[in-house]
Amino acid sequence: MHSFQEFYNVYKSPAGNTGESYSDFTRTVASPQQTNDTIAPKKNSECLIVIPAYTNRISEFEQMNLKNNVERLGKCFDICIVCPKLLRADVYNSIASGVELQYLRLPSRNFIGKNSYSNMLLSADFYKHFTAWKYILILQLDVYIFG
């Protein structure tokens, strides 16, 4: 398994055969210096669970997954919701009930479609927010953790 820092070092380099550099994608992602949200390790863990969220209206299925996953993972790992600036935290906090969630609010343009979301995930600036952890797990809301 590679550490997050190894991953970051690889992906901050040019994008290979596309002819684009990852700096081309950073126009859509706020760097840690440009956002007011500060996320920091709170638990004694090397791994951060990152949950992308883009709407205040999450389906019953997504609510069930979020509740289950934060109950299972929130005891041991820090959890961060990556979301647009205008997302209401109370929607997610009420589902997480008792598990502290951190929020990283990024420009809404990163969440308007598959291309902008993919570009955000390809951006080195996105991963700069998480350098305090050795590993990150990006956990989509359609995932249900068993065990």
Regions found by a protein language model. Name each.
Residues 82-134:
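Active-site-proximal specificity loops/subdomain of glycosyltransferases
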